[in-house]
């Protein structure tokens, strides 16, 4: 059975955890994934991750908020920034918001003739 379905994604804001993974991520077979420069992609929000990972440092600090901000910035740069997501292959291209329509249209043109060969049945016993 031959099927055609273009799977194109644009990440415009926060894409965290299993919610991101299940909503047409590269891991589930998206053909093209774009992200805006201010998007955040990862397992969790950088502030929340910093609170968990650096709880001891935060507890010892007199200025809790500055330590959280500092550690969150480090975490975001290494784990949840759009550049790190692109380096890991989760995002194909980082695009400016004003260019979104152009890139999505180009992806549709590129994938217009896409065909997938799939088995007739999803489950062989049914």
Where in the sequence are the language-model features?
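Ligand-binding clefts of soluble mixed alpha/beta catalytic domains
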Residues: 1-3, 7-126
């Amino acid at each position: 059975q031959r099927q055609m379905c273009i799977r194109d994604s644009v990440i415009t804001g926060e894409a965290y955890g299993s919610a991101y993974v299940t909503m047409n991520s590269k891991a589930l077979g998206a053909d093209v994934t774009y992200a805006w420069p201010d998007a955040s992609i990862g397992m969790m929000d950088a502030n929340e991750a910093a609170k968990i990972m650096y709880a001891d440092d935060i507890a010892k600090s007199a200025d809790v908020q500055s330590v959280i901000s500092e550690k969150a910035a480090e975490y975001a740069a290494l784990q949840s920034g759009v550049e790190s997501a692109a380096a890991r292959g989760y995002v194909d291209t980082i695009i400016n918001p004003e260019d979104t329509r152009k890139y999505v249209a180009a992806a549709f043109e590129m994938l217009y003739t896409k065909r997938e060969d799939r088995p007739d049945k999803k489950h062989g016993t049914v």
